[in-house]
A protein has these predicted regions:
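A short, Lys/Arg-rich alpha-helix, primarily the initiator
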Residues: 1-29
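Short, conserved catalytic or interaction motifs in soluble domains
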Residues: 50
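Short amphipathic recognition helices of helix-turn-helix/homeodomain-type DNA-binding modules
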Residues: 73-82
Length: 82
């Protein structure tokens, strides 16, 4: 019996960096600390911002809800793919 190889996850480092930069931009524009946002959203903001973890769409949605943004407003200023 042959076992299937696990699928390799596709990673796009440029996209990851672009999303993280947008999260930092929004958080900083409100003068919020990583800890403040983490405490109020339950998200691990420090891990996202250091690149240790990548936010899922659900995490991005929670982040947007906290800042009263739509996903469209979050992604609109991004120039991706470059």
């Amino acid at each position: 019996m042959m076992s299937e190889k696990p699928k390799k996850q596709r990673r796009d480092e440029v996209l990851y960096k672009t999303i993280i930069e947008r999260m930092i931009e929004i958080r900083s524009s409100y003068g919020h600390t990583q800890e403040y946002v983490a405490h109020n959203t339950g998200l691990d903001i420090p891990h996202f911002e250091t690149g240790r973890d990548f936010p899922t769409m659900t995490s991005i949605s929670v982040f947007c809800e906290f800042y009263n943004l739509t996903l469209g407003e979050f992604f609109a200023p991004m120039n991706y793919p470059p």
